[in-house]
Amino acid sequence: MTATSLWELAERARKRLSEIAKGNRDRALLAMADLLEARWEEVLRANREDLEEAERTGLPKAKLDRLALKEKDLKTLTEGLRQIARLPDPLGRIEGLAKRPNGLRVGRMRVPLGLIGFIYEARPGATVEAVSVALKAGNAMLLRGGKEAFRSNRALVALWHEALEEAGLPEEAVTLVPTTDREAVLEMCRLELLDLLIPRGGEELIRLVQQEARVPVLAHAKGVNHLYVDEKADLSMALRLALNGKTQRPAVCNALEAVLVHEKVAEAFLPRLEKAMREKGVELRACPRALPLLKEAVPAREDEWDREYLDLVLRVKVVSGLEEALAHIARYGSRHTEAICTEDPKAAWRFLEEVDASLVLWNASTRFNDGFELGLGAEIGISTSKLHAYGPMGPLELTTLKWVALGEGQERT
């Protein structure tokens, strides 16, 4: 695909932005939910073709897991669409309206960001979730999905076009870059017609987009997520949280990658953790202080403490207390998701206040860092950068504020 043809796709989308913002966006979301329920088998058929080719080419297991659509995904996606449709319209409301001494009323109005470029790896569910969030906020989307999911994405975008037509909205609101050529990623990075670029995938993709982009970038980076088991933790609860965080779905960004255990409870907790993880097929990699308490763990290398496994592998470290846990997270964490298990409110609140992450949890699984679970309906990604948005990005995070002033003929003196 040439840079010129990509420019033309983006230009057509930009020309329809005002129609998208003013149109019946909720109707399009509800229509898409209905179409998914009626035509899910078509989507699964395209997804099976993608999976067969990916398996032939040796795609890693973690990526195959993200590529695969399952029957249960239908319920998650349709519930998310309908939940977003029920959310208040984020556009048009004026915030902070205040009257100046001269009678001029000033405030800030919520408006769409505009045309968003979304570059993402082999995760077709994001073609539904990301578009639904962007559309609710009145934005148009230019999509470049991973080549492994091309058939799945094409089938889903075709349904989006039907939903948009049913709602009286232009199909340019959702445009799929019609090529698997990696050069299209670089062309999107150079496309100055975009108002924002959102990359969602591995470190290599994120770094490439950040280096090459000529427009603002909101990065969805890796999740090096920790659970700190405090000396006053309920150890049965801590075990459940560790199992849920690591084994429910290990190949996602909010999965648990490391457990930090207070030295006073390590002897009681670590053998239980090893037994439970072994039953789930999880390999433990441990620090020197933890190794004597574990029968089958292997030593953790120094260069892997900041690694995102996306697999059934878990790091374990014994720490002297909260201070060391905080220091470890500050050094190795990725500002994604961090959790503490404790019955001590003082320790919990210090953890909540001092840990720098997009979601910090007390006595809950890291798996809750998700737009649907946090009441956003869905998300376009989880931002680990602080400018504009931090954490799951729902419709509100895909708007911006412009100043408006309501006058009665005031002139500046």
From Swiss-Prot:
Subcellular location: Cytoplasm
Protein name (database record): Gamma-glutamyl phosphate reductase
Species assigned in the record: Thermus thermophilus (strain ATCC BAA-163 / DSM 7039 / HB27)
Pfam family, one: Aldedh
GO cellular component: cytoplasm
Keyword Cell membrane: no
Enzyme class: oxidoreductase
Entry coiled-coil feature ranges: none
Swiss-Prot/TrEMBL GO biological process terms: L-proline biosynthetic process
Xref: NCBIfam families: PRK00197.1, proA
Record-listed E.C. numbers: 1.2.1.41
Pathway entry: Amino-acid biosynthesis; L-proline biosynthesis; L-glutamate 5-semialdehyde from L-glutamate: step 2/2
